[in-house]
């Protein structure tokens, strides 16, 4: 079979394996690279190469993550796999590896286990939008009724956490057999069917440039004779000269107009996602704007003080706290470019939170911040990072 030409023109989609320890996430990851390399080109990564994942630091947190890539007929996939449960928790909460969709691996022999549940809950909390299931080790279950029972359990569990359990594709197979090149239904064809399910079920992610304009403000300058310039890196969307924009967060929302965009001291007619720019604001005084606010397309984002979040608390070894914290804890929450103090309410029945834990909390900030669900933040004490979190629900 001739290999199709490897091109970079295919849309790029980020996925990752999640699920209970020893259910076959890393074996499946290796099988995906092998089966797809054979069909569409790309590089096969063996189990040992993936399992020895290098440690990375994201927001001051050490996370071991393996990154692999493979092609399908329609797409280029970037895929993350983590060696340990704690790495998954950290990865999902910090957004170090943003996922457009997740592959939930469940052993058909064991059915859903505690980490299966925990990873589904985390996926819901941090806003992983789509899940596709690979029911692994199907060769270890002789009774087809038992296999159906496990499938039902998985669907129920997904529905419980607000995923569309009845509609989610579930592919049955054996990652190990696929990795060994087995051509039977549960071998290579099962992995090919999984990739087809990713292609069909996970929609192409919206590119940052197509989303509503947003730029976190890093600095504010006054330029005599020209007015006020704010600088920062455009997070999403496009800003054109002459467009009306809002300044959101910390103070009451204010409207202004962009009268100029500059980059590297050159004037442009627009700035777009990824650009480091200065934006000239009409009629805005230097003292009306500050770091920590955002420039945004009018009506696209609102300021909030009260929200629910999922946080990971750094362990002592990671440079975090040495002691637990309790209800009413008041650290700083670092959003984009600035710290805001907030008070923490723990869930009912949770007395305290230990370093190394992850927990759902409620936060009330002393000043409003422009936010939407999925926004990442750091938890800090006097400039030192002690945790990482993600906004899971806005309360007010």
Swiss-Prot record:
Chain residues that bind GTP: 19-26, 81-85, 136-139
Database matches in PROSITE patterns: G_TR_1, G_TR_2
GO molecular function, one term: guanosine tetraphosphate binding
Region (G5): 174-176
Species, as recorded: Methylococcus capsulatus (strain ATCC 33009 / NCIMB 11132 / Bath)
Positions of region (G3): 81-84
Residues annotated as binding Mg(2+): 26
Ribosomal protein found in the keyword field: no
Name of the protein this chain belongs to: Elongation factor Tu
Region (G2) location: 60-64
Family: Belongs to the TRAFAC class translation factor GTPase superfamily. Classic translation factor GTPase family. EF-Tu/EF-1A subfamily.
Catalyses which reaction(s): GTP + H2O = GDP + phosphate + H(+)
Function: GTP hydrolase that promotes the GTP-dependent binding of aminoacyl-tRNA to the A-site of ribosomes during protein biosynthesis.
Recorded GO CC terms: cytosol
Gene: tuf1
CDD domains membership: EF_Tu, EFTU_II, EFTU_III
Keyword terms of this UniProt record: Cytoplasm, Elongation factor, GTP-binding, Hydrolase, Magnesium, Metal-binding, Nucleotide-binding, Protein biosynthesis
Location of this chain's protein in the cell: Cytoplasm
Main localization (coarse): cytoplasm
């Amino acid at each position: 079979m001739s290999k199709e030409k490897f091109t970079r023109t295919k849309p790029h989609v980020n996925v990752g394996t999640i699920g209970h320890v020893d259910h076959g996430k890393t074996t499946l990851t290796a099988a995906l690279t092998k089966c797809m390399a054979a069909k569409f080109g790309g590089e096969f990564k063996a189990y040992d190469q993936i399992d020895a994942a290098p440690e990375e630091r994201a927001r001051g947190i050490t996370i071991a993550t393996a990154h692999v890539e493979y092609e399908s007929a329609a797409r280029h996939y970037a895929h993350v796999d983590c060696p340990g449960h704690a790495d998954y928790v950290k990865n999902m909460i910090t957004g170090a590896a943003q996922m457009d969709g997740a592959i939930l691996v469940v052993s058909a022999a064991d059915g859903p286990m505690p980490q299966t549940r925990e990873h589904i809950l985390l996926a819901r909390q941090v806003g992983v939008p789509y899940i596709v299931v690979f029911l692994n080790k199907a060769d270890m279950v002789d009774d087809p009724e038992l296999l159906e029972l496990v499938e039902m359990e998985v669907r129920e569990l997904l529905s419980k956490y607000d995923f569309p359990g009845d509609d989610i594709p579930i592919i049955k197979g054996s990652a190990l057999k696929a990795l060994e090149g087995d051509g039977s239904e549960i071998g290579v064809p099962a992995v090919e069917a999984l990739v087809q399910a990713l292609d069909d079920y996970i929609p192409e992610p919206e590119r940052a440039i197509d989303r509503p304009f947003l730029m976190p403000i890093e600095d504010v300058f006054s330029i005599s004779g020209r007015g006020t310039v704010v600088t920062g890196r455009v997070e999403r969307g496009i800003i054109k000269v002459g467009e009306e924009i809002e300044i959101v967060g910390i103070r009451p929302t204010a409207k202004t107009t962009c009268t100029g965009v500059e980059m590297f001291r050159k004037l442009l007619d627009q700035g777009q996602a990824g650009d480091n720019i200065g934006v000239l604001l009409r009629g805005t005084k230097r003292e009306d704007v500050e770091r920590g606010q955002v420039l945004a397309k009018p009506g696209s984002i609102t300021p909030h003080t009260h929200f629910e979040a999922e946080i990971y608390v750094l362990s002592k070894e990671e440079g975090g706290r040495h002691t637990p914290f309790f209800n009413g804890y008041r650290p700083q929450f670092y959003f984009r470019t600035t710290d805001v103090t907030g008070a923490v309410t723990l869930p009912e029945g949770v007395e305290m939170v230990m370093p190394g834990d992850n927990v759902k909390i409620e936060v009330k900030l002393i000043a409003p911040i422009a936010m939407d669900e999925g926004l990442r933040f750091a938890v800090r004490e006097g400039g030192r990072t002690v945790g990482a979190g993600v906004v899971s629900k806005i309360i007010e």
